[in-house]
Amino acid sequence: MGQALGLVQVDQSTVAIKESFGKFDEVLEPGCHFLPWCIGKQIAGYLSLRVQQLDVRCETKTKDNVFVNVVASVQYRALAEKASDAFYRLSNTREQIQSYVFDVIRASVPKMNLDDAFEQKNEIAKAVEDELEKAMSMYGYEIVQTLIVDIEPDEHVKRAMNEINAAARLRVAANEKAEAEKILQIKRAEGDAESKYLAGLGIARQRQAIVDGLRDSVLAFSENVPGTSAKDVMDMVLVTQYFDTMKEIGASSKSSSVFIPHGPGAVKDIAAQIRDGQLQAKLI
């Protein structure tokens, strides 16, 4: 009805291309416009000024001969002041942008190894954006932003990369575990050494106390029982120690100690060996 009356509506973020007898006349801004169609005025088409997005998937090969799919996302929009160029000069904007993306990616990625391509995604995106901006500005389009969304290697390469990463992580974990075991063993050895040191001090003090006690016993027995010599007292002490030892060994049913020689007569031999050792020490 509006067109029949010569009225046309242009929506927000949109411009209309007005022609007069097939020739470009002017760009109509959003709003209501009078269009006298009876004198050859008409709308050739509408052009959106909204930001549009185009995702481009490009297959190429890296410097180390790995085939990858590079996914680029290009955001672009038509410029209102160059609406006539954007409308008339390009027949298929998306295909034109895609061609430039292919060209830049296939010129950049083959110069990089696969790992470098992952690290330099921003540099690739910047190269694509610069080339697009330079090429598309003459056609009335602005490149808002360009992103390299993903770099997808071949499935076999991806599996190999995952295995390499897994092996590296396992190696780090093994090293950490070995280091922890090493520290644990060192601490255990230090604790064992300290324990043995303290045990040695305890044994030394115990034996010192035994020696002091035996000395006091020998002196007291010799003073209180006339006619006894130190030898008689030592023999009696050794017999007492023998029976105490046998009692301690037999007190436990699970004892693994073996007393050799075990006969009572062996006490005499032990005493003789002690005396002989003392005599030899004095002679030396």
UniProtKB/Swiss-Prot annotation:
A GO CC annotation given for this chain: plasma membrane
State one Pfam family annotation: Band_7
Entry annotated with the keyword Cell membrane: yes
Q: Lipid moiety-binding region for N-myristoyl glycine? A: 2
Query: Which compartments does it reside in?
Result: Cell membrane
Record's keyword terms, sorted: Cell membrane, Lipoprotein, Membrane, Myristate
Fetch the InterPro entries from UniProt.
Band7/mec-2_domain, Band_7, Band_7/SPFH_dom_sf
Spell out the subunit comment: Interacts with LRR1.
Report the protein's function: Positive regulator of hypersensitive response (HR)-like cell death. May be involved in potassium ion channel regulation.
What this protein is called in its record is Hypersensitive-induced response protein 1
Gene designation per UniProt: HIR1
